[in-house]
Amino acid sequence: YVARIVMQNIIKALSKPEDTAMVSIFVPGELLTAAGLTPYSVEAMSCFIAGTQCEQPFLRKTEEEGFPETMCSYHRVFLGASLTGLVPAPKCMVYTNLACDGNMMTFPYLKQKQELSGFYIDVPYEKNEDSIQYVAGQLRELKKYLEDMTGKKIAESAVQQAVANSKQAAEYYSRQLALRKDHDPVSTLTNELYAIFMCHLLAGSKESVTYTKLLLEDVKKAPKGEGLRILWMHMMPFLQQPVKEVFNYSDQMHISTCDFVADGFQKVHHEDPYEAMAEKMVNCIYNGSVGQRIEKAKELAQLTEADGGILFAHWGCKGTIGASGLIKNSLEASGLPTIILDGDGCNPANTSDGQVSTRLQAYMEMLKEAKSHDTLCL
């Protein structure tokens, strides 16, 4: 189900650009759902392109434009695809400074280069009520902007319904998460990646509610396995062969939860729909101090009774790479064996399959031994 929905989103974005909005991953999908626009993000489109194994020409195009190789590969592939015309110009773009510094290069550049209309959401570093109200005010302006771009009024009832859908999806997700310590559904890295799009790009849609409801039912039916439970942190390298071999349809290792997805399906408490969307943005674990990422990881590990944690340090993601040592040390101090897996979720040229395979296999053996003896010497 979720594969079909995500593919339909990409197809619509490519075939009907006049009805699409180019967005960064943390932009509230609820308002775009209410506006009737098809959102697509840098990460979603680049994953789709990389999945067809044709990312290299677009990476070269981006280099020709002067962008550094150290920039996030998701953004570099997307820029190249946009500049060569593969990704058609959208009706508008909506972006934010939240989490990814690549946003502040990609979106302003394409806005000027392709003369696109754009809306920017500024999310403060501080996590408090003032920040929530500040962002909520911008989201009310975003609604007006989308009305101007589409030429259609957005009913307040549509916004309220979209936010209500998000809250329902978050409830279903929370319920299945609580069951994970006793149920181990067999899945794939790609399915886990799709979940990221459902909690952000398609937030507020009926499809997101259906997805989380089906996920809950699948988890309920799944038996408890003998394999290792893993807390995954950050993006999914769904194309990398050694990672696929370890996790796809495996009864040896299960991704019990991913912090990126759990954060996207976080529970919000404000009743006002704009304040609720703002709360989700401000309280995002990738905003502010790394301390919240660490605490969220500990919470998820305890809830799912994870045997270990894997932090994927994606090429060019300066925030995650810079914080990786602190995250690893903090989690291991709390008793969760953690490995930092360096790689690239979009460009296979930036990683070594052999090295990744060796490290993953060694880590898996270490966790198996620890589980069999119910102890681990760090």
Regions found by a protein language model. Name each.
Residues Y1-D19, A136, R140, K144-K267, ...:
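A charged, amphipathic alpha-helical module
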Residues Y1-S46:
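N-terminal signal-anchor module of multipass membrane proteins
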Residues L31-R60, L231-Q302:
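Redox- and metal-dependent alpha/beta enzyme cores, enriched for Fe-S-associated oxidoreductases
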Residues E65-T84, I285-E299:
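Glycine-rich, highly charged phosphate/nucleotide-binding loops
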Residues G288, R293-G335, I339:
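C-terminal hydrophobic structural anchor segments
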Residues G325-L378:
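Peripheral docking tails and interdomain loops at the edges
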